[in-house]
């Protein structure tokens, strides 16, 4: 859990200097225009990205599991864990199948891209399958978990 928590945290943290140095990527034909120029506004907008959100959810829940001897029992924790796992898998699939191909022109950008769009979407579900306590995804928790990505999409 330590590694599967630390890597998405590093990915989220390295997003901020990328936002300071690069304009928003606005992909043609996706239905929106504008974006943020490089600088504080783009850096502070990083948490609005689905990639950032999904990696932050995985980081927070993985580090919580790593810090505790026994797994949390609350519906809220396991709903957030489930939302993070599902969201980071969606991030990996959508980015690599649809959005990949944009130029990553710095080492930090390439590192961040690989971490958040390839490594974490594979590592998080693998760690979940190997180490998470069984029986934590219930219909109630799955329903609660769906609220997070739906709120992001709204």
Identify the function of each model-found stretch.
Residues 76-79, 104-116, 139-141:
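Non-cytosolic membrane-interface motifs at loop->transmembrane helix junctions
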Residues 26-44:
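Perimembrane loop-to-helix junctions flanking transmembrane segments
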Residues 8-16, 88-97, 148-154:
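Aromatic-anchored segments of alpha-helical transmembrane domains
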Residues 121-137:
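Alpha-helical transmembrane segments in multipass membrane proteins, preferentially the mid-helix core
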Residues 38-56:
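Interfacial helix-start motif at the membrane-water boundary
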Residues 72-87, 136-147:
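Interfacial segments of alpha-helical transmembrane regions
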Residues 96-105:
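Juxtamembrane "helix-exit" motif on the non-cytosolic side of transmembrane helices
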Residues 7-29:
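Alpha-helical transmembrane segments of multi-pass membrane proteins
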